[in-house]
Amino acid sequence: MALQRSNLEEFLTQTWAQRGLAACMLLPVSAVFGGLSALRRAAYRLGLSKSERLPVPVVVVGNIFVGGTGKTPLTIWLVHVLRQAGYTPGVISRGYGVHNDVPQAVTPQSLAQEVGDEPLLIAYRAECPVMVGRDRVAVATALLAAHPEVDVLLSDDGLQHYRMARDVEIVLFDGRGAGNGWLLPAGPLREPVSRRRDFTVLNGAADAPGLPPDAIRMQLVGMTAEKLNDRSQTSALSSFAASDGKHAPTILAAAGIGNPGRFFGLLRSAGLQFEEMALPDHYDFADNPFAHVKADVILITEKDAVKCRQNEGLRNDTRLWVVPVTAQLDGALAEKIVEKLRGRSIA
């Protein structure tokens, strides 16, 4: 396929998976990066830099491994479980590609290029107040002013935004674990694996290198596909596979997410055979990458769907089907988070 991940992305993926020569050559730069990060954390810990506490509890969902690990599905799951616990949650986010200093509300009708694809997906799926902007504290303050009913805030990413005080930190990893365990740029980590947090969540793997044994397992489950131009029209993923002597349709699976292999693996687990198109993360779909694709069915992620709907040519392409995924986690995590928010501890 013409539109594929860059050679640099592939190189970094391979480099960060092992402690090879290329990674070793970058260790001096990683030492500088790590030292500066440690000084910044120490400044907040010692009170030299001030963290601002908001009038409602704050839960931060983030990762220290660069790239996608599944934060958005986890954030949507948290919105639902907190709502079930009696809270009225709101979500704040940086918003990929957002350059506006003024906090901006996100609705399902917002443009992805103005608010970011992940916040747009959260607004669409979670049906709660969502705002984006570069300054998390300003965004949170604006959201609370616009929605005084909100009594807990979820920060989609923002783990390193220390100026915003938080009550709960959830750090998410996937099957890549900690990679080679080194900090950027020699490795994939923004901070050491040993950094303090309240909960560690592992997405889509029974175990991963370099992670604590008490990590809470998360699975992304997707069993159906929905027509992009009519999401009331659904079909089981298994219906796209060959069966009873019938030939399966030719399928293209496309993903512009941080870890497209996870999406492709989900489709394979449903028994599908397909050609892969791994697009760059946050691919904007301003141009139609499927215009010259000869396939009967094109399966895409929800994150890509919010952008495809805003391109008329893609919106009218009847071959496009969206595969929604839902996070499944141990219910004990929800209980522990709620207890922590209420100021009580669990033995």
Swiss-Prot record:
Pfam families from the UniProt entry: LpxK
Function: Transfers the gamma-phosphate of ATP to the 4'-position of a tetraacyldisaccharide 1-phosphate intermediate (termed DS-1-P) to form tetraacyldisaccharide 1,4'-bis-phosphate (lipid IVA).
One BP annotation, GO: lipid A biosynthetic process
Keywords: ATP-binding, Kinase, Lipid A biosynthesis, Lipid biosynthesis, Lipid metabolism, Nucleotide-binding, Transferase
Signal peptide range in chain numbering: none
Enzyme class of the recorded protein, top EC level: transferase
Catalyses which reaction(s): a lipid A disaccharide + ATP = a lipid IVA + ADP + H(+)
Designated name of the protein: Tetraacyldisaccharide 4'-kinase
A GO CC term attached to the entry: plasma membrane
Species of origin: Janthinobacterium sp. (strain Marseille)
Domain of life (superkingdom): Bacteria
Membership in a protein family: Belongs to the LpxK family.
E.C. no: 2.7.1.130
PANTHER family (alphabetical): TETRAACYLDISACCHARIDE 4'-KINASE, TETRAACYLDISACCHARIDE 4'-KINASE, MITOCHONDRIAL-RELATED
Any one Gene Ontology molecular-function term assigned to this protein's record: tetraacyldisaccharide 4'-kinase activity
Keyword NAD: no
Residues where ATP binds: 65-72
Functional pathway: Glycolipid biosynthesis; lipid IV(A) biosynthesis; lipid IV(A) from (3R)-3-hydroxytetradecanoyl-[acyl-carrier-protein] and UDP-N-acetyl-alpha-D-glucosamine: step 6/6
